[in-house]
Structures are given as C-alpha cells and as structure tokens.
Amino acid sequence: MEEFLWVEKYRPNNIGDCVLPKELKTTLKEFVKNKNIPNLILSGGPGVGKTTAAKAMINEIGATYMLINASEDGNIDTLRTTIKNFASTVSLEGTGRKYIILDEADYLNPQSTQPALRGFMEEFSNNCGFILTCNYISRLIPALQSRCSIVQFITLKTEKPKLAMEFLVRVKDILNKENVKFDKKVVMEVLFKYFPDWRRVLNELQRYSASGQIDAGMLTNLQEVNINELMQALKKKEFTVVREWIVHNLNDDPSRIIRNIYDNLYDNVDASTIPHAVVILAEYSYKSAFVADHEINMLACLTEIMSQVKFK
C-alpha cells in the first residue's frame, strides 16, 4: 500500500538526492563517508526529511535497520520486546552495527519510556545505533540528548529559494512519471504554501491529481488560513465564530496554526498581555502532541486567549 504513496515511492535512497540545506547535507554525508553513524537526534518540523535522511544514510552504508513510529508503538512494552530483540542480536548481513530509527520520539513518555530507552542505548551500544527523529527536541529528556549528536533540520531564509526550486524540479519529474498534467504556477503555489513540508506538498498534489490534472481548481481547496478573521472573532469574543473557524481550518497542521497566531499577536494584541498570550500558546502547543482531539484542544486554547488577553 505504501508504494502507492508518492512520498514512499519516490523517497531518495541516498543523502545526495535529498532536498536539504547545504550545511546539513554536508554533515550527513560525513557520517556516510566515515561509515560511522553515531546515535543521532534529528530535530525539525514535520515533512522536512528527517526520516528520509535517516533511511538514506543507513541505506548508503548497507546496514540493517528497524523503523518504529513512537506515536503509534511507543509504549514501554515495545522497548522491552521489539527493540530489545532486535538490538541484542548481531546483523545477519555482516555489515556491523544495526540501527533503530525511532520516528517521532518526542511522543515517548518522558517519565517511563524515555528513561528506559536511555538504558537500552547504553546496554546495546556495541552493536546497535539509535536515530531519533522529533519535532520538538525540548520534549526529549536531557539524558537522551546528552547521549546523541543533535542535528537540527533548519532552513535559513536565504536558502529557501534554492531549495524550493530544487524540490520543484523533483516534483515536476514525479508528475511526469505519473503522467499527470500540471500547471507549473499552481505547483509552485502549493510548494510555497507548505514549504518546507515536502511530505505535505507531495500528499496534496497526489490527492488532487486523482481528478486528472493539477490546475487552478486546486488552489480553491488550498486557500490560506484566514488568521485576520480569527483575530477579529477573538477580539469580539464571538465563541461560535471561533468554533466554526476551527472546524473549517483544523485540517491544516495545528502547530502551524498556533505559529500563525503567534506571528500575528503583535499586530492585534495589546503589548501588556502579549507575554500571557505567548504562555497560553506554548502550553497548548505542548499539549497538542498528546491530545486525542485536536479540535477540543485548539478551542480550549483560543477560549483562554479570548477571555484572558486584551486586544487592540
């Protein structure tokens, strides 16, 4: 089933083919060149290529690996069984160290599972390496951070145009291989809307391509989240309007919405209450990694802002 997803079908197999900032790519290439990948924490936003980079490095050195999604299988029993069974045996391929990629490791329980993982990293250090990916490195306990080299997936503004064009070439090649007709300008708009979330770009293009082609009609479904509309509703304390806004916009990444609200605080909120608004946003941003219902969490966040923050 995964092969039907473009993000899997066209996932790069080596670091050279990954769309990454120059300095970051150089760092990862050094690990491959030395055939020695240390315990790593790859930190950055969703869809920027952390898991792809981890797989590509391991593929290039010819090592065996196991991928575990911590948000789905990250309970302590998984560590005690699956990880232990894999990490404690020698690779049958005779390529030396094996690796465990722990995707979305910031979802692991910091009181129980993360300390247990620290113990396994030490116990099996001779024949197994660990690569942890996360969106928020602050959610990983210091004991894990100190046992790993930390690699930040950060794109500077000066690098954005070059990376965007590089990915545009990649996307056009994929669309041509899939025999999908497309409007280049529309593809570029989609790319810049979700930059640097490459996974989101491909998923949106694949989803819309089912209609036969990528054209201007796609943009109707991808209108920017109207933060100004939300800010006005918060200012007027229109709870029903705020709730409707959430329902219509929560298909976007919740963390991206919170970031957009933060970016617009200074234009809409009285300076004296901005610090309090920031604390509220930070609290609910943290909670968003654990809640079962993002709509309720977002509404609780905005209700608190509406009632406790003074608007201009």
Task: List PLM regions with ranges.
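Conserved small helical "lid"/interfacial subdomain of P-loop NTPases
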Residues: 148, 155-186
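The conserved phosphate-sensing helix
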Residues: 183-184, 193-206, 239-240, 254-256, ...
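C-terminal helical "lid" of AAA+/P-loop NTPase domains
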Residues: 188-211, 244-247, 262
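Conserved C-terminal helix/linker of AAA+ ATPases
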Residues: 202-232, 277-278
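Helix-rich C-terminal "collar"/helical-bundle subdomain used as an assembly and partner-interaction module
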Residues: 230-312
